[in-house]
Design a protein with these regions (language model features):
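Short sequence/structural segments immediately N-terminal
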Residues: 2-200
Length: 200
């Protein structure tokens, strides 16, 4: 009987270990999927206009081919090269808060049509700008090292950015449309009462 108990415990431990690994893999895969640009642009209906505007901005269509996606800018720790357990938990918390704003807005009708979305966008945009300012543009700095900024066509750009290296700054005061350029989206919605089609 004792021998059977040992084997039973062995399989319980192995099964629990395997279930834990599968649960963690499932969580990480789900979080990565829910943070993808495809999820934000096509699955989450409140983001259709935002996704189109992102594709018009420098982060969505950079001539170099390097793009910054939704999570890179809008999740506090997403631009970190390596995330420890606490950083990942913080990222999950921020993701839940961000998703709840969009989801709740969709449920109560705040973003249920392109026109209501267009009316609410300035307020939401100011909230996002406030978030960026509140964390001193941490996600911008996660990708852009201000001390390394250089443009051979305009060498003074490096000098100007270097001034802000250790200071509080407002990236959006100079780079307003870098993440999203809403001109075409706004015009399309006003004319057609619909979001512009997203090219896949």
């Amino acid at each position: 009987m004792a021998e059977r108990s040992k084997w039973f415990m062995f399989w319980v431990v192995c099964g629990s270990f395997l279930a834990g690994i599968l649960a963690v893999c499932g969580l990480v895969s789900g979080v990565n999927w829910a943070g993808s640009d495809k999820f934000c642009g096509t699955f989450c209906h409140t983001m259709n206009g935002v996704a189109y505007a992102w594709k018009q901005g420098a982060h969505g269509r950079n001539p170099s081919g390097v793009t910054a996606g939704c999570s890179d800018c809008h999740l506090y720790n997403a631009s970190e090269p390596v995330l420890g357990p606490l950083g990942y938990i913080s990222l999950l918390g921020h993701k839940v808060v961000a998703a709840s704003h969009s989801g709740f807005g969709q449920v109560i009708g705040r973003f249920d049509t392109p026109m209501t979305w267009l009316q609410q966008r300035p307020e939401v945009e100011q909230q996002e700008i406030g978030w960026f300012k509140g964390n001193n543009f941490h996600t911008c700095r996660g990708c852009h090292d201000l001390s390394l900024m250089y443009d051979k066509m305009n060498p003074s750009i490096g000098a100007w950015h270097a001034l802000y290296k250790d200071q509080t700054l407002d990236c959006l005061s100079c780079h307003k449309d870098v993440g999203h350029d809403y001109k075409q989206v706004d015009e399309y919605i006003k004319t057609n009462n619909a979001y512009p089609p997203l090219d896949e």
